[in-house]
């Protein structure tokens, strides 16, 4: 056991539903065996009275959204939380509130992905064009859609990327279908992907890929089909069985995602936002074989990730060690780590595949300024079954040093306070 962990204190705030779903008490017990004290925070009391805290783990998404709706109680809770963070910059926060705000807004997170992909210049990645609709569709809507590279069919999602309503989506096949769209929302080109979704669950330097069912293929271009309204959570459940996921036939390219691409995307998001606990939804374009990021989620459910608690504890140990040694520990490149796969049917897509290194990937970002600066920074500068794929460790841990996380809080604070 690492002796530097003895006496460390980890505070957490999660909804009761999240605590039960994750069985978070088991994580608390795992921490105690390593000499770490785990404290369940009560935000109705001053956090100062519950400290000192070396690490805070939270999912304040509901509270943040309610605060943005000017709910007085939620505003007070967020203020109290941020006040403690500001007073204790040495406390590691998983994850910074400004980063969570970005991930709660699909329009902002899609724009961030677009900038990351433009910088990576990796031909294996090409996420779909998107556009935010802020008002009811009018005469100029089709022109704006075309200007932004959108074509039928496209998928319509709520702008807010959290909560029950965030899973309510629609596939629109023609101009008549636009009448049913309720703004504010984000529209995104629908990419045929042979009804397979890959959910990437990231925990610090580690990630696990879980295969889920997804929407079947649809013909490109305008058609006379009526819009399809669906709940993405229900469609992509491991045991989901729906006419929307029943693939008529496999078309074009059908392969699993590249570990290298996932590693680089995960690393780039960590560097851009300073986040450690997030999920990435990836599909493979069945015409080009390219990876498309269709959503990014803050602190997902980690269903199917058997090593979640171990990964989380290891990540906490890494960032605490980096803090105690002045960041030296985080400069080492962690080796890839594979977990044993879950039982899978023969011919499953979960077989390992090694990809050649691409010099154009953002593995060369270390020491460079990233171009996907936030608005504030720019201003200051001027199928059917669930299958688990290999569990990896990201090849770089520099993106989550405590100093970097505090930089993210500072650089995004102005933007967050204005939302």
Curated annotation (Swiss-Prot):
The family assignment reads: Belongs to the ITPK1 family.
PTM details? Acetylation by EP300 and CREBBP destabilizes ITPK1, and down-regulates enzymatic activity. Deacetylated by SIRT1.
- Which keywords annotate this record? Acetylation, ATP-binding, Hydrolase, Isomerase, Kinase, Magnesium, Metal-binding, Nucleotide-binding, Phosphoprotein, Transferase
Positions of modified residues (Phosphoserine): 401
What binding partners and quaternary form does the record give? Monomer. Interacts with GPS1/COPS1.
**Mind telling me what this protein is named?**
Inositol-tetrakisphosphate 1-kinase
Q: Where on this chain does ATP bind?
A: 106, 157, 188-199, 214, 232, 236
Q: Where is the ATP-grasp domain?
A: 117-334
From the UniProt record, list the reaction(s) this protein catalyses: 1D-myo-inositol 3,4,5,6-tetrakisphosphate + ATP = 1D-myo-inositol 1,3,4,5,6-pentakisphosphate + ADP + H(+); 1D-myo-inositol 1,3,4-trisphosphate + ATP = 1D-myo-inositol 1,3,4,5-tetrakisphosphate + ADP + H(+); 1D-myo-inositol 1,3,4-trisphosphate + ATP = 1D-myo-inositol 1,3,4,6-tetrakisphosphate + ADP + H(+); 1D-myo-inositol 3,4,6-trisphosphate + ATP = 1D-myo-inositol 1,3,4,6-tetrakisphosphate + ADP + H(+)
Its cofactor is: Mg(2+)
Top enzyme class = transferase
Function (record text): Kinase that can phosphorylate various inositol polyphosphate such as Ins(3,4,5,6)P4 or Ins(1,3,4)P3. Phosphorylates Ins(3,4,5,6)P4 at position 1 to form Ins(1,3,4,5,6)P5. This reaction is thought to have regulatory importance, since Ins(3,4,5,6)P4 is an inhibitor of plasma membrane Ca(2+)-activated Cl(-) channels, while Ins(1,3,4,5,6)P5 is not. Also phosphorylates Ins(1,3,4)P3 on O-5 and O-6 to form Ins(1,3,4,6)P4, an essential molecule in the hexakisphosphate (InsP6) pathway.
Residues annotated for Mg(2+) 2 binding in this entry? 295, 297
Q: How is the cofactor bound?
A: Binds 2 magnesium ions per subunit.
GO BP annotations, alphabetical order = inositol trisphosphate metabolic process; necroptotic process; neural tube development
Sites where N6-acetyllysine occurs are at: 388, 415
User: In the Enzyme Commission scheme, what number(s) does this protein have?
Assistant: 2.7.1.134, 2.7.1.159
Q: Which organism is it from?
A: Mus musculus (Mouse)
Q: Which Pfam family, an example, fits this chain?
A: Ins134_P3_kin
Any one of the GO CC terms: apical plasma membrane
């Amino acid at each position: 056991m690492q002796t530097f962990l003895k006496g460390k204190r980890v505070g957490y705030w999660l909804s009761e539903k999240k605590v039960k779903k994750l069985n978070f008490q088991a994580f608390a017990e795992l921490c105690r065996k390593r000499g770490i004290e785990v404290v369940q925070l009560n935000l109705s009391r001053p956090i100062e009275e519950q400290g000192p805290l070396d690490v805070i783990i939270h999912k304040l998404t509901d509270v943040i959204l309610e605060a943005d709706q000017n709910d007085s109680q939620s505003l007070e809770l967020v203020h109290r939380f941020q006040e403690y963070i500001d007073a204790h910059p040495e406390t590691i926060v998983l994850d910074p509130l400004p980063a969570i705000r970005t991930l709660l807004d699909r329009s902002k997170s899609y724009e961030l992905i677009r900038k990351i992909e433009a910088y990576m210049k990796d031909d294996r990645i090409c996420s779909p064009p998107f556009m935010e609709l802020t008002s009811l569709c009018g005469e100029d809507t089709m022109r704006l859609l075309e200007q932004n590279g959108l074509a039928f069919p496209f998928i319509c999602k709520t702008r807010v990327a959290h909560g029950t309503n965030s899973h309510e989506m629609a596939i629109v096949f023609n101009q008549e279908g636009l009448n049913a769209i309720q703004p504010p929302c984000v529209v995104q080109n629908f990419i045929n992907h042979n009804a397979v979704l890959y959910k990437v669950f990231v925990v610090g330097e580690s990630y696990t890929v879980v295969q889920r069912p997804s929407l079947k293929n649809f013909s490109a271009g305008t058609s006379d089909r009526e819009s399809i309204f669906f709940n993405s959570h229900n469609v992509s459940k491991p045991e989901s069985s729906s006419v929307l996921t029943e693939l008529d036939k496999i078309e074009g390219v059908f392969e699993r995602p590249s570990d290298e691409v996932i590693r680089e995307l995960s690393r780039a998001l960590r560097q851009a936002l300073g986040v450690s606990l997030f999920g990435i939804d990836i599909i493979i374009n069945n015409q080009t074989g390219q990876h498309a990021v269709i959503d990014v989620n803050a602190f997902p459910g980690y269903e199917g990730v058997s090593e979640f608690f171990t990964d989380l504890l290891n990540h906490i140990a890494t960032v605490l060690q980096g803090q105690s040694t002045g960041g030296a520990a985080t400069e080492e490149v962690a080796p890839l780590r594979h977990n044993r796969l879950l039982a899978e049917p023969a011919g499953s897509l979960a077989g390992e595949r090694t990809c050649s290194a691409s010099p154009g990937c953002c593995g060369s970002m270390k020491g460079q300024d990233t171009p996907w600066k936030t608005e504030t920074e720019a201003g200051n500068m001027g199928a059917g079954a669930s299958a688990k794929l290999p569990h990896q460790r990201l090849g770089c841990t520099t993106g989550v040093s405590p100093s970097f996380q505090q930089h993210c809080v500072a650089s995004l604070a102005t933007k967050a306070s204005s939302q």
